[in-house]
Swiss-Prot record:
Name of the gene encoding the protein in the UniProt record: fmt
Similarity comment: family membership: Belongs to the Fmt family.
Known EC number: 2.1.2.9
Annotated keywords: Protein biosynthesis, Transferase
Organism: Edwardsiella ictaluri (strain 93-146)
Protein name: Methionyl-tRNA formyltransferase
Amino acid sequence: MSHSLRIIFAGTPDFAARHLEALLASDHQIVGVFTQPDRPSGRGNKLTPSPVKALALQHDLPVFQPASLRPEENQRLVASLQADVMVVVAYGLILPQAVLDMPRLGCVNVHGSLLPRWRGAAPIQRALWAGDSETGVTIMQMDAGLDTGDMLLKLSCLITQDDTSATLYDKLSALGPQGLLTTLAQLADGRAQAQQQDDALACYAEKLSKEEARLDWQLPAEQLARCVRAFNPWPVSFFMLEGQPVKVWGANVLHQESDAQPGTIVGADKQGIAVATAQGILLLTQLQPAGKKSMAARDLLNSRKESFLAGTLLD
């Protein structure tokens, strides 16, 4: 039977909230929750609490929202909570060395990749876009570097041909809490075994930009299909047609070659809109014209068939 730990939890988005839920259901004591300041959101730009803050308040947990942990008064606040360990999941703020050293068992992070592959901000999307066959979560002891700390536990899952960032996010949201609770039990009992990362195997998952989501027809169809899956649900792949962006939510690869210029529509029917690429044909199956909802290609063709005639060049 492992011992109960005094835990500070630091996290912000829904992915982090799912880990907080698991801790709330455990025997551990959460002595404080740190999350980013409320941000403007929605059409009215109303200040909105993070998913972690909303969950913490539901459970009457003390919530702290500093803009930085560098000021000494904020570091004194962390120290005053006398935590055994600080659990950090997608918090979004840098932890100074003084904070990393405060808890008796240090600071533990849940990262959405099999480290040292895909250190950085967008590991789920980059793994999909690169065509990786598996990914997972790594529980690590934090140090001052970017996802460079010693690894305490790794759990993996397969990436299927149908996975998007949304579905992979859900898979890792289930794996992460499981791995976290196992690691905390090992830390509490002194059974945790840390393994150093091999820096030679490291690669970095840079933050996504909307510009990257524009489909480049000079790439092979296989790579473009991965791009569509990686950028679903954000920022969503797109192309330009008649001066307007058309988002692509779903696409498949047709293993056929075409002599047409990449970006040229070579066919359109109820199955989808077929576009020539540098190698193979990309079949667009789910699209969203500007100002409209996402729809199946056949529904778009019913209303705008003249825009998707064979020979039309997409930008």
